[in-house]
Amino acid sequence: GTLTRELAASAKEVFAFEIDEKLKPVLAETLADCPNAQVTFKDFLKVDLAALERELAPYTVVANLPYYITSPLVMRFVEESEKAGALVIMVQDDVAKRFCAEAGTPEYGAITAAIARRASAEIVKYVPRRMFYPVPNVDSAVVKLTFERDRIPVRSAKCYRDTVRAAFLSRRKTLENNLVNAFSLTREQAQAALHAANVPDKARGETLSPKQLAHLSDVLFELREKQVTIPH
């Protein structure tokens, strides 16, 4: 309720979601003088986002998330949202670093590449654990994801997701091997796809930038379109 009050003081409208219905009386009291704040008691991960967005103008998401839903919630907006302008969320600091990581670093992973196709990511502020009571076991950070239309264009969002998943299937294996396994390609097909995307034969997935992964996904999409035996 505290965050919602602050948002209501500066925003025209605030649509808040809370999963715990036991908080209804507390929030009713806390937000009694905030007529522009509307609280829906529902698990946001089960909300029909497309239906919700049909009723909304472009918006910003602000949240202090339970850490266990951070990735699925962020990916909902990355994969489904048409109107989110930005996400400003507090997350574990190691998760924030993964959101913002560069290719080839230990923090760089599938979620980094997934986010990068739609949004830029930056750490706005680090929040040490001593700022909370009771003191948690981890530090936190406020991270901002800013959505940009066609930030990294791809021919198929699904093929990009499949390519990212394949790239990080196993960090110990080459991307060629991962493509063979994930896309059911012959080794020759995998090599041809890598060559067409200007990716070295022995490259590992975690060394490719999101733009390189997008190029590779377009090549793989063209193979699918030509009805090469790659399962959908």
Question: Where in the sequence are the language-model features?
Answer:
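An accessory alpha-helical subdomain
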Residues: 141, 145-147, 152-190, 197-200, ...
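S-adenosyl-L-methionine
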Residues: 175, 204, 220-222
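Amphipathic alpha-helical segments that form the core helices of the histone-fold
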Residues: 195-202, 213-219
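Generic structural signal of hydrophobic/aromatic residues within well-ordered alpha-helices
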Residues: 111, 190-193
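Catalytic cores of RNA-modifying enzymes
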Residues: 1-162, 206, 215, 222, ...
